[in-house]
Amino acid sequence: ETKIIGDEIGKASALKMCYAAYSKGTTALLTAILATAESPGVRDELYRQWDSDDPNFSAQANRRTTRVTAKAWRFEGEMREISSTFEEAGLPNGFHQAAAEIYHRMAGFKDVAETPRLEDVLESILK
């Protein structure tokens, strides 16, 4: 559904960048958190902590991490665009630069027929 959000050029692009900054940016953050927890072997403890606050959070995080793998190669460029959008607004842009790197590391899953195992995704991030 097309919506008009104003007469000014660039408003729709800015909205798209802000929306993806959250939706795809938080998925990259969750993926990085899971990989970081995997490295010292505290992922199960993290799950217990998350699930004590929100009983389905760890399952949602796992699902979000694995379901983006086939499209992650596209998200790298989008995160770089978002980073530029933040910079143009006078805001720090490092988070989305890091998100671009997370998606870059997942690019090997492009066109994979089946959703990969979480452990395989985390291994690709930790390389």
Q: Over which residues does each language-model region extend?
A:
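A short, charged helix-loop
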Residues: 1-9
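Short, surface-exposed, polar/charged, turn-prone segments marking secondary-structure boundaries
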Residues: 8, 31-33, 124
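Glycine-rich "substrate-gating" loop/helix at the edge of Rossmann-like oxidoreductase active sites
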Residues: 9-10, 21
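Helical "substrate-binding/catalytic lid" subdomain
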Residues: 15-115
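Short, basic/aromatic-enriched C-terminal tail that caps enzymatic domains
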Residues: 114-127
